[in-house]
Amino acid sequence: MYGKKNIEGGKLMEESLYSFENFSHEQALILGVKAQQIVKEENLKAVGIRIVYKDLLVFQYLMDGKKEDNWLKRKAKTVLDSGHSSYYVYCHQEDYQTWIDDESYSICGGGYPIIENGQCVGAICISGLKHGDDHELIVRILKEMEDAR
């Protein structure tokens, strides 16, 4: 059985596995489309997908039934301000106490850092599934992209 600290450590290791020498807008498009395809093929709930890179919104898609992107924005802010996945922040809440009641942050899974040359330069966000499933979908897509390289 995994404790909170084991999950937290695993999320940090996971972040180091999926990084980029050079991320591009083209990769953002590939990531976003892949996420949409998986959700559709597996008949999952409708999701919103948002990818921010170097302060630019480079991809956003709200599937039919999604009307707001506020959770996506909150997850992106959580990632960009922490430098970690929003799931890591969720597991490590004691260090982010001031964010818990701040509605500009989202203390749950579904936001993932774009790490380029060791620096967090963006965020990949999915919202609409259970928060752990949002996180795992992002990791799955990043793993598939890594395996294809």
Regions inferred by a protein language model and the residue ranges of each:
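Flexible, solvent-exposed loop/hinge segments and secondary-structure transition points
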Residues: 1-115, 119-146
